């Protein structure tokens, strides 16, 4: 699966499964706008009834499986984040962007693994 990562140096295509930076692409990353009224909200992403909110606190994520009616905390071991993206067809696949590294969850934001590539100053991330 491929994602686009907006950085200060441009937008990179990243193969998430093979953990490879495929190169720069000429495509802007539109940060998803999810209408949420949560304190200290940094970014949010949704697919179906799954909503993942990145907040400026520890742990950095709030996850809802019922479109925001109830929430659970997630990402206790993650660093501060800048962006998040829920895969539109597989809502258990979630990308979390820290300053220069992507983290992937394949189980609805319960467990995370750092992806190998480091990128310069990540600003946004989106599945493509």
What spans do the regions from the language model cover?
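Extracellular glycan-interacting surfaces
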Residues: 1-128
């Amino acid at each position: 699966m491929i994602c686009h990562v907006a950085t200060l140096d441009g937008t990179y295509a990243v193969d998430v499964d093979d953990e490879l930076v495929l190169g720069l692409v000429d495509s802007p990353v539109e940060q998803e706008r999810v209408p949420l009224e949560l304190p200290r909200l940094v970014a949010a992403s949704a697919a179906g009834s799954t909503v993942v909110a990145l907040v400026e606190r520890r742990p950095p994520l709030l996850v809802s499986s019922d479109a925001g009616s109830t929430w659970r905390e997630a990402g206790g071991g993650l660093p501060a984040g800048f962006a998040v993206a829920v895969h539109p067809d597989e809502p258990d696949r979630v990308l979390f962007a820290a300053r220069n590294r992507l983290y992937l969850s394949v189980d609805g934001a319960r467990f995370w693994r750092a992806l190998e590539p480091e990128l310069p100053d990540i600003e946004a991330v989106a599945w493509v």
